[in-house]
Amino acid sequence: MKAYQRQFIEFALNKQVLKFGEFTLKSGRTSPYFFNAGLFNTGRDLALLGRFYAEALVDSGIEFDLLFGPAYKGIPIATTTAVALAEHHERDVPYCFNRKEAKTHGEGGTLVGSPLQGRVMLVDDVITAGTAIRESMEIIGAGGATLAGVLISLDRQERGRADISAIQEVERDYHCKVISIVTLKDLIVYLEEKPEMADHLAAVRAYREQYGV
């Protein structure tokens, strides 16, 4: 695990974005941890979040021309990632996002920002069922652009209804790489370094054993 990944986990814990305990997920599973990126909700949070996304993006080595943030949660993520790439990595990258409702006046349409073209890096908070990715693929394809990859904050590395995860389904269906700032494996490594969190470590390991990919 790299330094920025450890820092991201601590950032998420401090903001209570990442919690350990017992949580019932939409799937009905009882999870030993919960991740709610919506709690990154201040200016400082967004500035730091952008740095972590930019770091993971540069670390991945994936070539891309434009950042796309699907409405709604992806919009501030794309924006802050673009700012961080410019400020900390000297990369002035165009960005774009969509509206849920088409605008009928002014410039019109469903897209805001730079023209949607070239190799697109889609940024979002998490992938649960892959629905937002599929909707975004229709938008990206309609503009003649191609998907370079997908970047999210956390990969839970757990099976969906099938034997593979929603992320693996996206990679299979769209022939792209999905990268994340951290994964469930990274959370386990972090917990292994914290003796005072041994109970949580045992619970997360058991969960991975049951639902992991």
Curated annotation (Swiss-Prot):
GO terms assigned for molecular function: magnesium ion binding; orotate phosphoribosyltransferase activity
E.C. designation(s): 2.4.2.10
Keyword ATP-binding: no
Binding site for 5-phospho-alpha-D-ribose 1-diphosphate: 26, 72-73, 99-100, 103, 105, 124-132
InterPro entries: OPRT, Or_phspho_trans_dom, PRibTrfase_dom, PRTase-like
Keywords, ordered alphabetically: Glycosyltransferase, Magnesium, Pyrimidine biosynthesis, Transferase
Involved pathway(s): Pyrimidine metabolism; UMP biosynthesis via de novo pathway; UMP from orotate: step 1/2
Pfam families according to UniProt: Pribosyltran
Cellular component aspect of the GO annotation: cytoplasm
Cofactors that this protein relies on: Mg(2+)
Binding site for orotate: F34, F35, T128, R156
GO biological process entries: 'de novo' pyrimidine nucleobase biosynthetic process; 'de novo' UMP biosynthetic process; pyrimidine ribonucleoside biosynthetic process
Known catalytic reactions: orotidine 5'-phosphate + diphosphate = orotate + 5-phospho-alpha-D-ribose 1-diphosphate
Its job: Catalyzes the transfer of a ribosyl phosphate group from 5-phosphoribose 1-diphosphate to orotate, leading to the formation of orotidine monophosphate (OMP).
HAMAP family in alphabetical order: PyrE
Binding partners and assembly: Homodimer.
Family, similarity comment: Belongs to the purine/pyrimidine phosphoribosyltransferase family. PyrE subfamily.
The protein, known as: Orotate phosphoribosyltransferase
The species this protein was found in: Serratia proteamaculans (strain 568)
